[in-house]
Amino acid sequence: MQWEVVIGLETHTQLSTASKIFSGTSTAFGAEPNTQASPVDLALPGVLPVLNKGAVERAIQFGLAIGATIAPRSIFARKNYFYPDLPKGYQISQYEIPVVQGGSITIQVEGKKGEVYEKTVQLTRAHLEEDAGKSLHEDFAGMTGIDLNRAGTPLLEIVTEPDMRSAAEAVAYAKALHSLVVWLGICDGNMQEGSFRCDANVSVRPVGQKEFGTRREIKNLNSFRFLQQAIEYEVQWQINEIEDGRKIQQATVLFDPDTGETRAMRTKEDAHDYRYFPDPDLMPLEIDAAWIERVRGELPELPAAMQARFVSQYGLSAYDASTLTASKAMASYYEAVVAEVGAANAKPAANWLMGDVASQLNREGISIDAAPVKPLQLARLLARIADGTVSNNTAKKDVFPAMWAGESNGDADAIIAAKGLKQMSDTGELEKIIDDVLAANAKSVEEFRAGKEKAFNALVGQAMKATKGKANPAQVNELLKKKLG
């Protein structure tokens, strides 16, 4: 039987406010346990929550960026459940009327055969809520410690429709969402610190069946790699269970990165289990049109708009434009390079950024902001390739690595001069070298004239070797063809 995978994601995005959503306590990461917990966060009697305006504005920003509806009036609700790190016995969230409704995110997905296709993922909602505290299970002689520093941290929970049909699509969506919230500046995107966490709702059904299968929710996935591994394992587990004649039970599961397996944590709750009701301590959130338009006017150019501009202005492919706008820092770097080399060299600049620069960044595990070669320095190297001072191959093999290592303060001209890498510009000298190559390789000349194209490439190689790689390959080709008739 053929199976179809159905995936929906819920993403908890920590908003980049300096203080918590309902108190003035700091949200800074890494403080000593329980040093950033106010009476509101601790749920002490007689204290009331006060909504953080900055959290609301970040939610509006996100809603506008995805083409969603911003609710003119939304309500905060109490989500009731008992857990040691939830001191109130309930979490303040939004249920019936969220602040952000609908919207979509378009993603680029790499298929199984390497082809890239586009897909639009519809969003159900995004709602504001507070985070819970943290339970610590180590170093307490078998007991659990509670750190409430995180309690009350502002979250925007972003929920998709069950639109994704593979782990690859889910990861592509998560990466696109991560890029967007970081681009907007509403989240720092630090997955190691818990600023961006995904829950994956996964089910399978026979191909062609309209009804959804029973879903299981994989909680708190804090890396794209874990997201992919967890979904792939869960999908195969569910298929095996069904094919062995067992029914899938709705459940919340955890992913163990050490074993690569998911395991059930508890029976999955439904909404009625949480006994949602409007929070009597908070007034409804009212957002007028003027507020929305003010926030809209402060939005940066969005990734989708920039992608379209890169295609029309610089002649890039949709895939290249998507890659270069994966982060605001990368897009800014690229535009800074193009500003120096001109639109005519926009494509070579893109190739360098997605090729050699990206390879070095990945090798060292750093972001483009930390790249030792700055935009102006890379632009100077591209200019030397364009004016024929060095070949593209020499630039890649000899000049760029030296720039990255900080030789001559990363100055391309100084490195070219110091290493003697400048291409030959004397046509007469090059013609003499080619004459010598032809005389020394009579057999290759005969083979070429007999119709063997490989012989021509061999002659080009010999000429480049004779010039120690300093000749312009295009000029070598031209002169050889001229002399060979």
Curated annotation (Swiss-Prot):
Pfam families, sorted: GatB_N (PF02934), GatB_Yqey (PF02637)
Keywords in alphabetical order: ATP-binding, Ligase, Nucleotide-binding, Protein biosynthesis
Reactions catalysed according to its record: L-glutamyl-tRNA(Gln) + L-glutamine + ATP + H2O = L-glutaminyl-tRNA(Gln) + L-glutamate + ADP + phosphate + H(+); L-aspartyl-tRNA(Asn) + L-glutamine + ATP + H2O = L-asparaginyl-tRNA(Asn) + L-glutamate + ADP + phosphate + 2 H(+)
EC number(s) from the headed UniProt entry: 6.3.5.-
MF (Gene Ontology): asparaginyl-tRNA synthase (glutamine-hydrolyzing) activity; ATP binding; glutaminyl-tRNA synthase (glutamine-hydrolyzing) activity
One annotated GO biological process: translation
Oligomer status and interactors: Heterotrimer of A, B and C subunits.
Function: Allows the formation of correctly charged Asn-tRNA(Asn) or Gln-tRNA(Gln) through the transamidation of misacylated Asp-tRNA(Asn) or Glu-tRNA(Gln) in organisms which lack either or both of asparaginyl-tRNA or glutaminyl-tRNA synthetases. The reaction takes place in the presence of glutamine and ATP through an activated phospho-Asp-tRNA(Asn) or phospho-Glu-tRNA(Gln).
Similarity section: Belongs to the GatB/GatE family. GatB subfamily.
Identification of the protein by name: Aspartyl/glutamyl-tRNA(Asn/Gln) amidotransferase subunit B
Organism: Cupriavidus pinatubonensis (strain JMP 134 / LMG 1197) (Cupriavidus necator (strain JMP 134))
Lineage: Bacteria, Pseudomonadati, Pseudomonadota, Betaproteobacteria, Burkholderiales
